[in-house]
UniProtKB/Swiss-Prot annotation:
Compartments in which it is found: Secreted
Organism: Pogonomyrmex rugosus (Desert harvester ant)
Tissue specificity remark: Expressed by the venom gland.
Signal peptide: 1-25
GO cellular component: extracellular region
Protein's UniProt name: Myrmicitoxin(1)-Pr5a
UniProt record similarity statement: Belongs to the formicidae venom clade 3 family.
Propeptide span(s): 26-37
Main location as per UniProt: secreted
UniProtKB keywords: Amidation, Neurotoxin, Secreted, Signal, Toxin
A GO term, aspect molecular function: toxin activity
Described purpose of this protein according to its UniProt entry: Toxin that causes a rapid and irreversible paralysis when intrathoracically injected into insects (blowflies). Does not cause spontaneous nocifensive behaviors by intraplantar injection in mice. Exhibits hemolytic and cytotoxic activities on HEK293 cells.
Residues with the Valine amide modification: V65
Amino acid sequence: MRSLYLSFSLTIIFVLVIMHAEAKAISEPNAIAEADPRFLNILKTIGKILLPIIPTVAEKIKEKVG
């Protein structure tokens, strides 16, 4: 159960970071191009880790709720 909460929390954090990056890209079109490459690599790594987890988390939530 604890791992479910951890996965869900990490997924939400990742989504919020991506939304923030998209909002910044809209308001400042050159912001992503000027972003620190290390930050972008960290985002890519987090994405690679979390994307396979998201469907599993969604299924577990469906099982708990319904």
